[in-house]
A protein has these predicted regions:
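Class I SAM-dependent methyltransferase SAM/SAH-binding core
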Residues: 60, 66-117
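Conserved class I S-adenosyl-L-methionine
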Residues: 156-168
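A short acidic, Gly/Pro-enriched loop at the edge of an enzyme's catalytic core
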Residues: 118-128
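Residues lining the SAM
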Residues: 131-134
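Short glycine-centered segments of the SAM/dcSAM-binding site in methyltransferase folds
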Residues: 58, 82, 154-156
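Hydrophobic beta-strand segment of the Class I
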Residues: 59, 128-129
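Class I SAM-dependent transferase core
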Residues: 2-60
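A short glycine-rich, Lys/Arg-flanked "PGG" loop and its adjoining helix->strand segment in the class I
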Residues: 75, 141-156
Length: 168
């Protein structure tokens, strides 16, 4: 049984504040996350540069998938930094781990989280990235609360959504 489905959590929402909760992208769609056009479509290099991440900080990529953003951030923060890759799908984390090993990166910690909790250590993160994943949160209040607990005093959250999933 996957950790995300731990039955101790609150019931999942189908909508939140009038917004339909999108279905989580299945791990079998992972190749799409690495598509060649992604840089052109999303201007990822520009976005990462604008984050102004510094060597030695700790970052968390919520909904990391197979690590498209995680690996970029891990490279910037360097070996003295700590990157947390947080995902509810262990299959995605396995792919991320393989990519990190291939790239020789050892500063990435994988976290298989639950739907309602990022499962990050408290007051441990300088920067949190949620790239194109918030619309999939079935427990938005609980997730944001757990992310807030993980932030250091001056921690920053970046919420990035590329398109409207809900027709409303």
């Amino acid at each position: 049984k996957k950790k995300a489905y731990d039955d101790q959590g609150p019931p999942a929402l189908l909508e939140y504040k009038g917004r339909e909760i999108a279905r989580t992208m299945h791990w079998q769609g992972a190749p799409w996350l690495m598509r060649k056009l992604r840089e052109e479509e999303e201007k990822t290099s520009e976005m990462i540069k604008e984050l102004k991440l510094k060597p030695g900080i700790s970052v968390a990529d919520i909904g990391s998938g197979n690590g498209y953003h995680t690996l970029m951030m891990a490279k910037i923060i360097g070996e003295k930094g700590q990157a947390y890759a947080v995902d509810i799908q262990p299959e995605m984390l396995i792919m991320l781990e393989e990519r990190a090993k291939k790239a020789g990166m050892e500063n990435i910690k994988l976290i298989e989280n639950r739907f309602w909790d990022a499962d990050l250590p408290e007051k441990s993160v300088d920067f949190v990235l949620m790239a194109d994943v918030y619309h999939e949160f079935s427990h938005p209040q609980q997730m944001l609360s757990s992310i807030k607990k993980s932030l250091k005093e001056d921690g920053v959250v970046c919420l990035l959504e590329f398109k409207s999933e809900d027709p409303k």
